[in-house]
């Protein structure tokens, strides 16, 4: 990292805080310090590697592992939803079942039909099914053929048999009054919405993390630059003081004071270097780079955007609608209500139906089986009454009810935490904006004070402690400004993550 002169530092301050003013001319001390810094001015930035905030965000979203994980997770959920929607459409299936059976009877009995024989049969069924979405049952239409071959030594009847059903239509419903399709649709829609929110949120979260690390490095660069200037300034002051001490212009106490100040500046510079190196490493890690270029130029800080016009209520509402955690919790709550409703229906008497009608004929040849078809109608009603289940059905319902209550409380807790986070972030954003304005004014005042003190010190109107105190106050004001600047941008991008605003 190359050192910079106070003129360059003031240019940086003017760039970041938009403070534009002309420096006052400094007398003797200006010439001494200026000569010391002249050889340390930075080279032209041409040839340095630059990096902007938009580039960092784009690189993080293109290269971060979490971005790929989020993309694949969303694709998986989307494919699952499309499969779910496909299963709600008409399904055409062909089912072929070969079967072999051997009947072994008592050989001592004199009944022919009880003697040993083998049966080989094959059934083929073509069926078109459709879920009846408004009611919860399933309707079907199809065609069926069965071929049976009998192998026996002594048998009456035909050794071969064909059963043909060219048309059959039916409807079945395992639990009347319960429509699982309506609940499944609600749950799957909510899960897809939650997955979409999760993917968008993950990308915004990556942008927030990238911005946080970008501004952390930008501020650490400027702190390092400031600490380097402080050390160079104190080195120059110490050299001047030692020359003056030889002719008894500076007391020994003042000389020791400058030496302490120089050591403090060296220690602060080392801390700033470690902080800047840490910020570099964190940003490079996010971008999946081994390290950032050594000749990386000073990161630019964008202009402060206009203030947001959202109220706290609007921010909370937008945060809820864009939060994947809340949307996932709503999906879990919907599924819990589904299971509670099903358990309540199964608690009492369960009624199921299966009705079908069609045409059917039996013959010993395949062709004749399709002739002289007979119309048939079959229907069954199934009643299931738990006469003695030791309270199992009731306990299942109580379990489902308790879980639903738990999910409702969990949804309320997620909503509370989101509302708290959104409200606090909005307050921090507004507070940091006010702090930025205040610290900009403080920097300007501290700079004016420093210039005046430098003139007084050069003219012998104040001691070195007063001059270094003015320098320290300027450094404190600049550090406070950078802290407010970093907090503002972190809050800005966190609010953008929460409510998805541009």
Segments from the language model and where they lie:
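Bacterial Sec-pathway N-terminal export signals of envelope proteins
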Residues: 47-121, 176, 180-183, 187-189, ...
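Metallo-beta-lactamase
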Residues: 272, 324, 484
